[in-house]
Amino acid sequence: MKTDNTITLEEISLPNGKKLVCKEPLVLKIVEKGSLLVVKNSKLGIHCYEYTEKKLLNEIKEDLQILWEEYALGRIDDLSPKAIGLKEQLLTFFTEKN
């Protein structure tokens, strides 16, 4: 069963004290699969699932922190062609601010 619920992100706190700011609000559609709530965005490498919206939001934020550190801030020489594409998408959607 699908739901019309969405999660909207505008910024995420990073472990280094900086903020990951969305250039435009990122709206993610929540789909119900059994008792799980699922969010997927292939362009940004997001595929998260949890049992509550609060836990799902935390999971999305944690995933984006990892994706940002590993791919957006990663050296191009260390990334595969597919990972470079993800890096470019992340840099298109987000910026890091103090």
Regions found by a protein language model. Name each.
Residues 1-25, 54, 58-98:
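Short, charged, surface-exposed hinge/linker loops at domain edges
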Residues 38-40, 49, 72:
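Short acidic, gly/pro-rich beta-turn/loop elements at beta-sheet edges
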Residues 42-54:
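A short, exposed loop/beta-hairpin motif centered on an aromatic-Gly-Thr core
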Residues 23-42:
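Short aromatic-glycine-(Arg/Gly/Cys) micro-motifs in beta-strand/loop hairpins
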